[in-house]
């Protein structure tokens, strides 16, 4: 299990979530990908790919489950859509990821716009968000979007193309910080990663898509 933190976060922000996974017997990794994630999200995605590659070589593990929290979800999505990271990822959970962008980024532009490319990239009008939404999900990769209904930092987006709206677009009560500390959100993550492999037929290019094509 690999956890990817968000904007102005550090690996420490993911520790409550990491501890829950570890207590349930899952080997869980967090990692540092830039000071408070101020760099370009493209750089963050490349670093994620390199980190996964190092873990594969060090541990001898072929595939990982990944949770991308907030802007970390955009990083993970960039990695699987454009950098072939899906080859090393079994399932991806986007936890409060602003996949439609967020105007809260304007506050970041006012305070850190000269220092941080990422605050510009997460605006709803950015080319980064447009390209990220337009690119298809890789065939066979199961992705679940999990959101908080009162999340002021990440307003509820539309489901990504290829997401099963009935099963893999989850909205629960809470705010942005609830996503990594509330047991309800953890329960949804745990359920997603523990579902049987047969449930991956809902993924783009899965068995359901093949049956429809026939």
Model regions: which residues?
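Helical cap/lid subdomain of alpha/beta-hydrolase-fold lipid enzymes
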Residues: 81-214
């Amino acid at each position: 299990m690999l956890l990817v933190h968000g904007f102005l976060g550090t690996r420490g922000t993911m520790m409550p979530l990491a501890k829950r996974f570890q207590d349930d017997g899952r080997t869980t990794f967090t990692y540092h990908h830039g000071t408070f994630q101020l760099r370009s999200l493209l750089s963050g995605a490349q670093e994620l790919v390199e980190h996964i590659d190092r873990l594969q070589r060090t541990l001898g593990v072929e595939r990982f489950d990944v949770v991308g929290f907030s802007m970390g979800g955009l990083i993970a999505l960039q990695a699987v859509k454009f950098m072939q990271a899906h080859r090393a990822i079994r399932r991806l959970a986007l936890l409060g990821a602003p996949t439609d962008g967020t105007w809260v980024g304007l506050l970041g532009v006012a305070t850190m716009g000269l220092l941080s490319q990422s605050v510009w990239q997460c605006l709803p009008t950015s080319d980064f968000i447009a390209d990220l939404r337009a690119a298809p999900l890789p065939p066979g990769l199961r992705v679940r979007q999990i959101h908080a209904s009162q999340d002021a930092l990440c307003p509820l987006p539309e489901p990504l193309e290829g997401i099963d709206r009935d099963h893999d677009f989850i909205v629960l009560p809470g705010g942005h910080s609830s996503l990594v500390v509330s047991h309800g959100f953890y329960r949804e993550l745990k359920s997603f990663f523990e579902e049987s492999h047969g449930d991956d037929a809902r993924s783009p290019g899965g068995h359901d898509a093949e049956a429809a094509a026939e």
